[in-house]
């Protein structure tokens, strides 16, 4: 499935983690189709609603970013990657901390499965460092480098393994772009508007305009759209910010 990336709306990924039931989730999909480029299904939504939720979005003409961050032994991740391709998603994630061999097997699985199905392979994205973590958290876990240094190392490893790109903090976009090239896809979560959102656990954040101006290919936005009085209007406002960032 080809991903259009030639306009501002296509760069906006909505994090679909509804607090209600399946009907509420589908209501959001129907409301936001045409206002966002892709719907991100994470662990919460996928565990609650299952693969049929992906199918429901695809049937409505939406594109899906399956963000399950596969992180296991290479063979297990390769099989999970095959399943993701067969689901028909446009993009899915693995975790770069799984190592080069794991990522290489995932890349190989995606290519082989897509070729057998006669389809364009989905975009395979490797998660670097979660935006909820800062340098002190890494130190607690035994890392001897900063979040930015680790993200860059993992991005280079992902590129060398053949991944399409990475998920990385907005602050890490510039060094990753410089090291990995202009065709390396960078997806940035941790996107917030000027208003503080209740329950926010993100630590390393930027606005949509700032992230795109720094070179992000896609931005992921959840709460600022989902909790808005009018989610579609909120999505359109973010699209306008993306346009401003592209013109920077």
Kindly give the residue locations of the regions a language model identified.
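N-terminal amphipathic alpha-helix/helix-capping segment at the start of soluble metabolic enzymes
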Residues: 1-27, 116-119, 174, 178-181, ...
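Conserved anion-binding
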Residues: 8-10, 76-164, 169-172, 179-183, ...
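Conserved beta-strand positions in the central sheet of alpha/beta enzyme cores
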Residues: 13, 37-40, 65, 93, ...
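Conserved, mostly hydrophobic/aromatic
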Residues: 14, 39, 69, 92, ...
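Short, acidic/polar
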Residues: 19-32, 74-83, 147-157, 203-210
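Structural motif
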Residues: 34, 60, 87, 161, ...
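Glycine-rich phosphate-binding active-site loops on the catalytic face of alpha/beta enzymes
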Residues: 87-101, 202-234
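C-terminal helical cap(s) of enzyme catalytic domains, especially alpha/beta-barrels
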Residues: 103-113, 212, 225-248
């Amino acid at each position: 499935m080809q991903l259009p990336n030639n306009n501002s709306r296509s760069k906006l990924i909505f994090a679909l983690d509804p607090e209600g039931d399946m009907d509420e989730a589908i209501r959001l999909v129907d409301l936001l189709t045409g206002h966002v480029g892709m719907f991100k299904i994470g662990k919460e939504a996928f565990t609650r609603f299952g693969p049929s939720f992906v199918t429901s979005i695809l049937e409505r003409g939406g594109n899906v970013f399956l963000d399950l961050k596969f992180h296991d032994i290479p063979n297990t991740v390769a099989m999970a990657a095959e399943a993701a391709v067969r689901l028909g998603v446009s993009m899915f994630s693995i975790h770069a901390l799984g190592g080069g061999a794991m990522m290489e097997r995932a890349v190989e699985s995606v290519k082989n499965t897509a070729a057998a199905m006669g389809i364009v392979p989905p975009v395979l994205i490797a998660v670097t460092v979660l935006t909820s973590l800062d340098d002190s958290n890494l130190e607690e876990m035994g890392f001897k480098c900063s979040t930015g240094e680790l993200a860059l190392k993992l991005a280079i490893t992902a590129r060398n393994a053949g991944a399409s790109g990475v998920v990385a903090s907005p602050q890490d976009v510039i060094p990753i772009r410089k090291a990995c090239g202009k065709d390396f896809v960078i997806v940035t979560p941790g996107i917030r508007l000027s208003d503080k959102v209740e329950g926010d656990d993100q630590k390393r954040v930027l606005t949509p305009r700032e992230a795109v101006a720094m070179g992000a290919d896609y931005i992921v936005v959840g709460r600022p759209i989902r909790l808005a009085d009018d989610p579609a209007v909120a999505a359109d406002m973010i699209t306008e910010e993306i346009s401003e960032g592209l013109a920077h």
